[in-house]
Design a protein with these regions (language model features):
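FIC/Doc superfamily catalytic core
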Residues: 1-328
Length: 328
C-alpha cells in the first residue's frame, strides 16, 4: 500500500520564496545578540500569544496579555484570561515538544485548552464545522471516526517527507486545520505546531511571532484555507504562509537591529564581565575599572536593567546593601 502524501505542488514561486527566506535567515544568524536580548524575545512571545488568541476572538489587548503573563490582576472574561495563561504555558514547552509526535501534539492541546473545553488533549468524538463571521458554514471536517487514522497518516508523512521544512510545516498546518482533530482550539494549536516544526529546523523560529503577521492578514489566512480546500490541494495556503514567514523574519531582523543600536558601549562592557551567578557592585566596578558608584549605577546598571539584560537578587529593594546582579 502506498504511503499517504498530502496533495500539493511545488511551484517556482514557492521555491523562490523559500530561497529568499533562507537567505534572510542567514543574515539574521549573523546578529548573534538575540540570545542577549531577553526583552525582545519576551515581547515577541507575548505578541505570538496575543495574536493567535485574538484570531480566536479573545478580547484581551497586548497590554492586558502582558499583565496576565506578568502575574498582574486583569479585568476581563475569565476564559480569555485562562486562555492566555494556558497559551503561555504551552509556548514555554516548545523546546521539550517533539513536533513529529502525535502524542506530543495532543499533550500540547491538553495544556492549551485545559479548563476551557471538555476533552482537552483528546481527539474529537463528534462532528465539527467551521463557521465564518456571517454564520455561514465554510468547512465541514471529516467524520470523527476518521480523525485518528488521518492524523496518524499525516504524522507518518511529516516524519518521512524530504520536503523543505518551510513548505512541509505549511502543508501540515493546512492539513491539520482541514482534519480539525479536536472539538475546539484547532486554530491556535495548528499555529503553535507550525512554529514548533520551524523551530526544529531553525531554533530562532521559537522567537519569531509568525502569529502576529497572520492576525494582521486574518481574512487572507481564511481565504487561503478556503481556496486550498476548494482546489483540493494546499498550494494557496503554502504560498500565503511563505509570504507571512518572510515578512515575520524581516521584522525580526529590523527589531533586533533596533534593539542592538540602543545598547551603549557601557552596557556592552558590563555584559562582557557580568556572570549568570550573582555579583556585587564592588566586584563589577572592579572588573570595569570604575571608581564612581553614581556613574556605575546611572550608565551601566540601570540601562542594563531597563533593557532586560540583567536582574537583581532583591528587585523589591534596589538599594539593598547586599544587592547582587546577574546576567539573564
Amino acid at each position: 500500500m502506498d504511503k499517504y502524501v498530502p496533495p500539493y505542488d511545488i511551484t517556482e514561486e514557492m521555491l523562490e520564496l523559500t530561497s529568499e527566506i533562507t537567505e534572510d535567515l542567514g543574515k539574521l544568524s549573523n546578529v548573534n545578540d538575540l540570545e542577549r536580548l531577553p526583552r525582545l524575545r519576551r515581547v515577541n512571545r507575548i505578541k505570538s500569544i496575543q495574536s493567535s488568541l485574538a484570531i480566536e476572538n479573545n478580547t484581551l489587548s497586548l497590554e492586558q496579555v502582558t499583565d496576565v503573563i506578568n502575574g498582574k490582576r486583569v479585568l476581563g472574561p475569565q476564559d480569555d484570561i485562562l486562555a492566555v495563561k494556558n497559551a503561555f504555558a504551552v509556548y514555554k514547552m516548545l523546546p521539550e515538544l517533539n513536533p513529529f509526535s502525535l502524542e506530543d501534539l495532543k499533550k500540547a492541546h491538553g495544556v492549551m485548552m485545559n479548563g476551557l473545553v471538555e476533552g482537552a488533549g483528546e481527539l474529537r468524538t463528534g462532528s465539527v464545522g467551521v463557521i465564518n463571521e456571517q454564520g455561514k458554514v465554510i468547512h465541514v471536517a471529516p467524520p470523527h471516526d476518521m480523525v485518528k487514522g488521518l492524523m496518524e497518516q499525516l504524522f507518518d508523512w511529516l516524519k518521512t517527507s524530504k520536503t523543505q521544512m518551510l513548505i512541509r510545516s505549511s502543508i501540515f498546518h493546512y492539513e491539520f486545520e482541514f482534519i480539525h482533530s479536536f472539538m475546539d482550539g484547532n486554530g491556535r494549536t495548528g499555529r503553535l505546531w507550525q512554529t514548533s516544526l520551524l523551530a526544529s529546523w531553525k531554533p530562532i523560529f521559537e522567537w519569531i511571532p509568525i502569529e502576529s503577521i497572520i492576525k494582521d492578514n486574518q481574512e487572507e489566512y481564511y481565504r487561503a484555507i478556503g481556496l486550498s480546500t476548494a482546489e483540493g490541494k494546499s498550494n494557496r495556503f503554502i504560498l500565503f504562509m511563505l509570504g507571512v514567514i518572510k515578512k515575520a523574519v524581516s521584522e525580526l531582523a529590523r527589531d533586533t537591529h533596533n534593539h542592538q543600536s540602543h545598547i551603549s558601549n557601557q552596557i556592552r562592557a558590563l555584559m562582557s564581565v557580568i556572570e549568570t551567578y550573582p555579583m556585587s557592585a564592588v566586584e563589577l566596578m572592579e572588573k570595569l575599572g570604575l571608581k564612581s558608584r553614581v556613574t556605575f549605577r546611572k550608565n551601566y546598571i540601570q540601562p542594563a536593567l531597563d533593557a532586560g539584560l540583567i536582574a537583581m537578587t532583591d528587585p523589591d529593594t534596589p538599594t539593598n546593601r547586599n544587592q547582587r546582579y546577574f546576567k539573564i
